[in-house]
């Protein structure tokens, strides 16, 4: 626009000059009309021309000034169009270079604490218009750059220690290491002290270690007497390094003067817990080794934030449980040490505030910790996620139980009236029915061609976790089956929850089993119940049967109490292909202990079934377990919920029936469909605890 403005002014000046010269030339007939002979009077025409040209000159001058200013403003803002991710959020390292626009001269808007009883309504209001008010609130936060200096971080010797050039610790809050002899600036690490809700320096927010800063990282952990490390990034995301692996996979490794030995590693569906024994390797050191726990949250997606805050809340509780009261600051890091790190710290602090004051003040707390480390909580989506986590915590609280308290809890549930005039168990289940069914995420299942493949049109998979089949050449919609991936206790997508096959979907069923390498099928319905078809018989009674490119041959059929165990030899042969046939053994566990109406009378049969399935999985490699009843929700959800709950009881001595079922309902609608089925989950857990000693082989 800039070249345009001088050109415009030049042409205007030329026009003005030409107009002035016209007074000295003889006008033509087409220019003038006169009733008198001779030239016109210049005194009458010149003022008229001036009055016409002056407004035009003023207008052009204003336009030129506007375009010049607009051009300058555009230069001041980084063009981020090429850096946008699919959900519109900039990735951490990209955002770090975005220039901040100047604040409104009227000053930042004030946001007040929110009483917890108003939290749900406030979130609803802020979420309207695509979270417009959340964005406004987030954009009103101070950046934190103005309040501090960064002299140490910007020293030439320290620049290579920073993962990102403009994510730096303030001088007044940086973690200071002991100075190493002969090494200038060896007291520097990109890490900052961060306060908790009431506790000063409760956390250390750090960047993910680089290869050249790993030694400094462990030196910091030792010198600060930290017993807990919280890791909120994966080592690589989208093929880019986010954090250097600063621990050995097994055995011991020495980082600088700190020896780190792996003591234990427990992998769960949302996070991994590693235990390290660390000890300084100095000639005159006689200090005792220390135990350090690393809790690595693995469910933060490459883009945006977790789909639900449930996993983060469970993770945060585990951090609180494992961190000793006498220990130094909790070390929290992601990649840059501001976005996910800040989100975690704010949720922790606001949960403490709920306990203490029954209110939250997210805006004030984020503003405060940004004075300690700039850009903490890096995106408006992370900021919104904090509120969602706090609402989840307020609405549902902590429903986790120790196994020793289960019996007392059940007595409370069955005997306590609520303000809804229902017993506690019914009220707990009522909360589950409030989990919203996300119909906007069911587009594929609601296509006309796919609706014909559903037994119950209300029970179809969400798009984000549906099981996808290979597309048949030239045949639309052949990648669809009414089946959802469901997380297990230790492994994501451990189950495939599906309906009982229909006659025209049985080929898709076997394609799913084959393509996803499922060696285990759990069937929780009869082929017919109450004279109604519940499931097409998708296996042969004897010999073999072929569905599409897959042949199923029955090899054995045995009945053990209430479970039929059938072994199938499954053969895949692609027509016209030169490759050899592929074969695989698949075992079906057909549970006959579920009555046509209601629930099983006792839990032992379900415990036996889960134990048998787990044993089969250990022998075949833990590929997805195919689970179905008729619609793929009620009994299917109950089996999966109990599998996850009992696995946790064995591993941790803890259970959370409510959150286990709630998590399933977020992955497939109507999982654990009735109050009876929900109560049955509690009953089976109680039976399992009572007879636990008889099931040592369950492990």
From Swiss-Prot:
Belongs to the protein-tyrosine phosphatase family. Receptor class 4 subfamily. Residues 69-699 are cytoplasmic. Its EC number is 3.1.3.48. Isoform 1 is highly expressed in the brain, lung, spleen and testis. Isoform 2 is highly expressed in thymus, spleen and lung. Isoform 1 and isoform 2 are expressed in primary hepatocytes. A catalytically active cytoplasmic form (p65) is produced by proteolytic cleavage of either isoform 1, isoform 2 or isoform 3. Isoform 1 and isoform 2 are phosphorylated on tyrosine residues by tyrosine kinase Neu. This is Receptor-type tyrosine-protein phosphatase epsilon. One of its GO terms (cellular component) is plasma membrane. The chain crosses the membrane at residues 48-68. The tyrosine-protein phosphatase 2 domain (D2) mediates dimerization. The extreme N- and C- termini of the D2 domain act to inhibit dimerization and removal of these sequences increases dimerization and inhibits enzyme activity. Residues 1-22 form the signal peptide. Glycans are attached at residues 23, 31. Residues 134-393, 425-688 form the Tyrosine-protein phosphatase domain. SMART domains: PTPc, PTPc_motif. Monomer. Isoform 2: Homodimer. Can form oligomers. Dimerization is increased by oxidative stress and decreased by EGFR. Isoform 2 interacts with GRB2. Residues 23-47 are extracellular. SUPFAM superfamilies: (Phosphotyrosine protein) phosphatases II. The lineage of its organism: Eukaryota, Metazoa, Chordata, Craniata, Vertebrata. The keyword Glycosyltransferase does not apply. Isoform 1 plays a critical role in signaling transduction pathways and phosphoprotein network topology in red blood cells. May play a role in osteoclast formation and function. Acts as a negative regulator of insulin receptor (IR) signaling and is involved in insulin-induced glucose metabolism mainly through direct dephosphorylation and inactivation of IR in hepatocytes and liver. Isoform 2 acts as a negative regulator of insulin receptor (IR) signaling in skeletal muscle. Regulates insulin-induced tyrosine phosphorylation of insulin receptor (IR) and insulin receptor substrate 1 (IRS-1), phosphorylation of protein kinase B and glycogen synthase kinase-3 and insulin induced stimulation of glucose uptake. Residues 20-41 are annotated as: Disordered. It comes from Rattus norvegicus (Rat). The active site is at residues 334, 629. Substrate binds at residues 302, 334-340, 378. PROSITE patterns: TYR_PHOSPHATASE_1, TYR_PHOSPHATASE_2, TYR_PHOSPHATASE_PTP. Keywords: Cell membrane, Cytoplasm, Glycoprotein, Hydrolase, Membrane, Phosphoprotein, Protein phosphatase, Repeat, Signal, Transmembrane, Transmembrane helix.
């Amino acid at each position: 626009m800039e070249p345009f403005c001088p050109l415009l002014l030049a042409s205007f000046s030329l026009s003005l000059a030409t107009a002035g010269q016209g007074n000295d030339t003889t006008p033509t007939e087409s220019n003038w009309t006169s009733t008198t002979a001779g030239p016109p009077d210049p005194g009458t025409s010149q003022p008229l021309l001036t009055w016409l040209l002056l407004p035009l000159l003023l207008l052009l001058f204003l336009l030129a000034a506007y375009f010049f200013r607009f051009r300058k403003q555009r230069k001041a803002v980084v063009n981020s169009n090429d850096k946008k991710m699919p959900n519109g959020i900039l990735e951490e390292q990209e955002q770090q270079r975005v220039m901040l626009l100047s604040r409104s001269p009227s000053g930042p808007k004030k946001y007040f604490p929110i009483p917890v009883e108003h939290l749900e309504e406030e979130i609803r209001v802020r979420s309207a218009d695509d979270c417009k008010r959340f964005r406004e609130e987030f954009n009103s936060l101070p950046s934190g750059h103005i309040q501090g200096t960064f002299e140490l971080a910007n020293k030439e010797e320290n620049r290579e220690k920073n993962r990102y050039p403009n994510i730096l610790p303030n001088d007044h809050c940086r973690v200071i290491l002991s100075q190493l002899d002969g090494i200038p600036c060896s007291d520097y690490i990109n890490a900052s002290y961060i306060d908790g809700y009431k506790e000063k320096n409760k956390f250390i927010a750090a960047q993910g270690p680089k290869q050249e800063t790993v030694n400094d990282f462990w030196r910091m952990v030792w010198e600060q007497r930290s017993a807990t490390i919280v890791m909120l990034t994966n080592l690589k995301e989208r093929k880019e390094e986010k954090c250097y692996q600063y621990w050995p996979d097994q055995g011991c490794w020495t980082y600088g003067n700190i020896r780190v030995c792996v003591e234990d590693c427990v992998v769960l569906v949302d996070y991994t817990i590693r235990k390290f024994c660390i000890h300084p390797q100095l000639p005159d050191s006689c200090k005792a080794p220390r135990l350090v726990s690393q809790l690595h949250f693995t469910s933060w997606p490459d883009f945006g934030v977790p789909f639900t805050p449930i996993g983060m809340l469970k993770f945060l509780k585990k951090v609180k449980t494992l961190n000793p009261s006498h220990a130094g600051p909790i070390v929290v890091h992601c990649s840059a040490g501001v976005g996910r790190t800040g989100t975690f710290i704010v949720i922790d602090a606001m949960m403490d505030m709920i306990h203490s004051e029954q209110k939250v003040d997210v805006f004030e707390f984020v503003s405060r910790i940004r004075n300690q480390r700039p850009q903490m909580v890096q995106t408006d989506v992370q900021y919104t996620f904090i509120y969602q986590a706090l609402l989840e915590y307020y609405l549902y609280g902590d429903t986790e139980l120790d196994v020793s308290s289960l019996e007392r809890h059940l007595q409370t549930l069955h005997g306590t009236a609520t303000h809804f005039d229902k017993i506690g168990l019914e009220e707990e289940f009522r909360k589950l029915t409030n989990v919203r069914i996300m119909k906007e995420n069911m587009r594929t299942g609601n296509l006309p061609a796919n609706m014909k493949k559903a037994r119950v049109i209300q029970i179809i998979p969400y798009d984000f976790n549906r099981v996808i089949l290979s597309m048949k050449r030239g045949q639309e919609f052949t990648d669809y089956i009414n089946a959802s991936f469901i997380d297990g206790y230790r492994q994501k997508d451990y189950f495939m929850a599906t309906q009982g096959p229909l006659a025209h979907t049985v080929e898709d069923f076997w394609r799913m089993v084959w393509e996803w390498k499922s060696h285990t099928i759990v069937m929780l319905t009869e082929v017919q119940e109450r004279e109604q078809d519940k499931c097409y018989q998708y296996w042969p009674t004897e010999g073999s049967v072929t569905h599409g490119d897959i042949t199923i041959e029955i090899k054995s059929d045995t009945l053990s109490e209430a479970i039929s165990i059938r072994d199938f030899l499954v053969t895949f042969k692609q027509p016209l292909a030169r490759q050899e046939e592929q074969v695989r053994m698949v075992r079906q566990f057909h549970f006959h202990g579920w009555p046509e109406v209601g629930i099983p009378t006792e839990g032992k049969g379900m415990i036996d079934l889960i134990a048998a399935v787990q044993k089969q999985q250990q022998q075949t490699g833990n590929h997805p377990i195919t689970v179905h009843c008729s619609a793929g929700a009620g009994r299917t959800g109950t089996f999966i919920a109990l599998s996850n709950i009992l696995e946790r009881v064995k591993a941790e001595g803890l259970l959370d029936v409510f959150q286990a079922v709630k998590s399933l309902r977020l992955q497939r609608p109507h999982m654990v469909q009735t109050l009876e089925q929900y109560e049955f989950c509690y009953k089976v857990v109680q039976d399992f605890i009572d007879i636990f000693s008889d099931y040592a082989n369950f492990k």
